[in-house]
Amino acid sequence: LEIFKQHNLNIIWQTGKSFSEKAHELIAAINSRGITTHSFIKEIELAYGLADIIVSRAGAIAISELCVVGKPVILIPSPNVAENHQYKNAQSLVNKNAAILVKDSKASNKLVDEIIKLQNNPILMKELSENIKRMEFKNAANVISDYALNLIKK
């Protein structure tokens, strides 16, 4: 966290309940106003809107949201999921140059460097944003509801 402060990076950190107290302690220890923690962010679209770079797990719902948002993304797939599906999700975006992948086991050593490198590369930030935005499934709700209605009619 100290390095974020040194680089004048502002962080909106959704910690989850289990890490919330520890995160508050860590931030208090470095006395940084630029880092805020939340056990859960109810209006995530506001946090996404404020972000220049988003760091996220790689679940299907998160990736769907990130495609709509169209911001540069660093994905850290959870290793604690069935059939390593988050890694596969993340890798599919990486293969389309739409995200950066950092393995969970490497995150403590590599994540900060990746954030700083990305922040200092506006060309890559723009490229990642454009590529992930292209993956947005437009009108998904209409497609799903039409499909469901067609199933009911059968």
Task: Please place each PLM-identified region on the residue numbering.
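C-terminal alpha-helical cap of glycosyltransferases
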Residues: 137-154
